[in-house]
């Protein structure tokens, strides 16, 4: 069974979001016909009510087309309210939960896939502390307990379902930024591979990516729909197609002249058991929309 996922990230409502791009996305959503829409965090800029309200409006529009799974990013966590109280983290997510529900790690089950999320945005936490002051509350942390929970979900799912892991922080190094989104990233990568995930959806770095982790896990890193792109690149979102034998990731890039998103590069990976490998043949692009053609920013 084929599963198609529209992968968005880093919208940054609150001054950075490009409203023309948001409108174009809303118009083309029905024509893309995804089975689900996944938003991998940073819906807001400063975790303010008005920013979350605008982000929720977009999620509600997307939900008319397909189920939507949303997770918080580091910008959605009001870490400054309790920066040094590690046991008082729940208030940090209060505003986010008001608009997107109490569950910070939702799971979505489709006929052909189980999509499980893990929380990497904790504000200031022991697991994400680094020697770089600019990374205070920016770096992510992927705790062992999170991956153990996800692995339990994957282990109990029917074999024919693709295993998709959703996190905010980029799990591979950005080509332009040369930065890892996660602290203790080597440990995190090993845990991801061991979890049984076949596909990872992430964002944070404001640069699109389609790569393999550990030689077998397909990683879709979505760009951003805000005005602060990495290296001045066009804004992007990803369209992920999971087939029984392959995974395809297509970038939709913003075209300034037409003011529309257009399908551009497509990357293909062959599915081998519960893993993947680069596929030698190019993949076809996803269905083209009728109404539209087709960064520390973190």
List each model region and its residues:
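N-terminal active-site segment of His-dependent metallophosphoesterases
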Residues: 1-63, 79-80, 145, 149-152, ...
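Beta-strand-turn-beta hairpins that frame and shape the catalytic cleft
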Residues: 1-6, 106-117, 158-162, 213-219
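Active-site environment of divalent metal-dependent phosphoester hydrolases
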Residues: 14-17, 45-50, 54, 72-82, ...
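Extended active-site neighborhood of metal-dependent phosphoesterases/phosphodiesterases
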Residues: 54-149, 191-193, 239
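Active-site-proximal segments of metal-dependent phosphoesterases and phosphodiesterases across multiple
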Residues: 128-136, 141, 157-199, 205
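Conserved beta-sheet core of the metallophosphoesterase superfamily
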Residues: 177-245
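A short C-terminal boundary segment appended to hydrolase-like catalytic domains
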Residues: 242-298
């Amino acid at each position: 069974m084929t599963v198609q996922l529209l992968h968005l990230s880093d919208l940054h409502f609150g001054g950075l979001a490009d409203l023309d791009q948001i409108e174009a996305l809303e118009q083309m959503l029905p024509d893309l016909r995804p089975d689900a829409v996944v938003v991998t965090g940073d819906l807001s800029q400063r975790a303010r009510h008005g920013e979350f309200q605008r982000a929720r409006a977009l999620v509600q529009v997307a939900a008319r087309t397909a189920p939507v799974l949303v997770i918080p990013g580091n910008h959605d966590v009001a870490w400054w309210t309790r920066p040094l109280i590690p046991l008082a983290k729940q208030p940090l997510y209060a505003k986010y939960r008001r608009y997107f529900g109490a569950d910070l790690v939702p799971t979505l089950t489709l006929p052909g896939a189980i999509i499980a999320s893990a929380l990497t945005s904790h504000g200031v936490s022991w697991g994400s502390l680094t020697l770089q002051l600019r990374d205070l509350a920016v770096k992510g942390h992927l705790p062992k307990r999170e991956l153990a929970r996800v692995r339990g979900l994957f282990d109990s799912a029917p074999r024919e379902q693709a295993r998709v892991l959703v996190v905010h922080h980029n799990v591979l190094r950005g080509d332009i930024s040369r930065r890892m989104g996660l602290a203790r990233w080597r440990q995190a990568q090993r845990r991801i591979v061991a979890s049984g995930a076949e596909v990872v959806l992430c964002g944070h770095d404001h640069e699109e990516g389609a790569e393999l982790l550990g030689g077998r896990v397909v990683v879709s890193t979505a760009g951003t729909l805000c005005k602060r792109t990495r290296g001045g690149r066009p804004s992007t979102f990803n369209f992920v197609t999971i087939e029984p034998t392959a995974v395809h990731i297509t970038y939709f890039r913003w075209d300034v002249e037409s003011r529309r998103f257009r399908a551009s590069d497509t990357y293909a990976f062959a599915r081998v058991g519960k893993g993947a490998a680069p596929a030698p043949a190019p993949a076809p692009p996803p269905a083209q929309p009728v109404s539209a053609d087709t960064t520390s920013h973190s």
